[in-house]
Swiss-Prot record:
The keyword RNA-binding applies. The keyword rRNA-binding applies. This is Small ribosomal subunit protein bS20. Gene3D superfamilies: Ribosomal protein S20. One of its GO terms (biological process) is translation. GO terms for cellular component: cytosol; small ribosomal subunit. Binds directly to 16S ribosomal RNA. Keywords: Ribonucleoprotein, Ribosomal protein, RNA-binding, rRNA-binding. It comes from Leuconostoc mesenteroides subsp. mesenteroides (strain ATCC 8293 / DSM 20343 / BCRC 11652 / CCM 1803 / JCM 6124 / NCDO 523 / NBRC 100496 / NCIMB 8023 / NCTC 12954 / NRRL B-1118 / 37Y). One of its GO terms (molecular function) is small ribosomal subunit rRNA binding. HAMAP family: Ribosomal_bS20 (MF_00500). Coiled coil: none annotated. Belongs to the bacterial ribosomal protein bS20 family.
Amino acid sequence: MPVIESAIQRVRLTKKQHDRNEPQLSAYRTAVKKFEKAAAAGTDNLAELYKAASSAIDHAYSKGLIKKNKASREKSRLAKYVK
């Protein structure tokens, strides 16, 4: 356990940030996996799932969970399947 007060505060803050970020990251990953699974199966609602995955990627980027280039790369990679 940290002894210095600023270190104690950082531990508290890090836990708070983790508790906030983890569900958002999970939702982003789940949306992408759902789309990839549907694309592999060849289902017909790919456009709808792409929209949800793209929205989840944008949300993760706007919250600072992923970087701009990763967001663009993910969306581009998923867009190949929609055509």
